[in-house]
Each structure stands twice: as structure tokens, then as C-alpha cells.
Amino acid sequence: MTHKFSYSLCFIISVCLLSGASSAQQLEIYIPENSTNVPEEKETDNILARCLATGLEEYCAGISLNANGTTLEANGPSDITLETFIIDLNDDTGTAKPRVTVKTDTGGAADTGQQTGSIDVKSAGIEIEFDFNSHKLRADQLDKVSVIATAFADDINAGKLYAIVGHTDGKGSDTYNCKLSAKRAATITSALLVGGAKAYLQPIGVGEVLLKDAANPANAQNRRVSFLKLDDNAETVINAFKALCD
């Protein structure tokens, strides 16, 4: 299949924003993947690379990124948050934008399968910090981004296609938030590519359309970037996410 879009990077990251001089707010960036629920054939000793390549809880549970960016397996809470984005292919609302929803994976019983006429895309989340209203990568986040780049440089991710989807909270105008989310996704994408990522990466901004906490639009958890691992339906998924800010 010939893809008629440019490739860029994809992974999930939670981003913390600084509001003023002293208070820090977190923004999450996620790395989603297609919900095939089939582990990759390749093996790797890089546990973060394995998590990003599969998006499965069994591979992502208990992963911890310590202060210097080292990846560790632990028995405590994971630094990876899993979400699923659901794209409705039978949307008959008559609007130009597709119907895309998001749900947090709670770690309970696995879904029996996606509904007919929809595409499910999984994501994995990692905390990355940005200053308030900024898309510039902070110096204190470079080590962590370097570790993520190494995971994308692993052979298990070589040649795979990922979309990086940037999100904002519900504050500000739709137009501004769409632009800011796109810039943050592009910043992370560039950093991963410079760090040696072997995957094809596509940055996309969706602004405030897909709030993680819709009941609290200003919640810092809504400010995130999602990384989606794409397969045969890549063009459909990318076009659906791009249309949310068109």
C-alpha cells in the first residue's frame, strides 16, 4: 500500500506545564498503537521499546523511568499510562469532523474486540514537561526524551509507523490550542528523530478535542501527546486525527 502522507514520529508523553514562576502542571503524552493484541515477533532487551511496540499492559506494567532517565522494571505503579482511541467509521452526524472518543485502560478484563465499523488505537503515556504556553523542550527533560528515542531506535520499532498526537486542555480558543498541540507534537518528533529513532513518525495536533478528563477541561492530565502505532489502516487513522483540527 502506498501512503500519500509524510511520516513522522509517535509515542505518548505526559507533559508538565509551568504556570508562573513556581507552580508546575503536568501534561501527558501518549504513545498509542493499533489494537491487534498480537505481540511483535522480534524480541528486545529494551523494556520501553517492547512496551511501545505492543501497547499491551503485560509489557508496559511496572515500567519506571527514574530521575536520570534510566528505564527500570518495578513492582510499583507504572510510569506508562495506557489509553484507547476509538474512531467511528460509521459516523452519521453530518459534521465534517469524524467521531473520535478516548477511554483510559483500567487494567481490568480485556475487551472481547472492537465494534464493527470502528478502529481502536492503543496508547502508552510518559511524563514530559513543557513550560506554560510553550512548545520548547525543557533542558531538564532531555535525558528522558533521550531514553524514549533509544526505545524508538531499537530494532523492534525499525520501519514501523507511529503518529504523535498532541493534546491541550480546554482553556483557550480552539484555533490556538490546535496550533499549540501541533507544535508540541512536532517538537517531540524532531527530538526523537535526532535521537536516532528508526520508526517513521507523523506529528499531529488535535487541540482540546480529545480530553482525557472531559468533566474537568482544565485538568493537567488533558495536556498530553499520544503515540499511535499504525498498521494497514494507517491512512484512515491519520486522516481522522488530522480532520479534528481542520
Region locations from a protein language model:
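N-terminal targeting leaders that direct proteins to extracytoplasmic destinations
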Residues: 2-10, 16-119, 246
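Solvent-exposed, acidic/flexible segments
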Residues: 41, 78, 134-142, 178-181, ...
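Periplasmic peptidoglycan-binding/anchoring modules of Gram-negative envelope and division proteins
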Residues: 130-165, 189-200, 227, 235-241
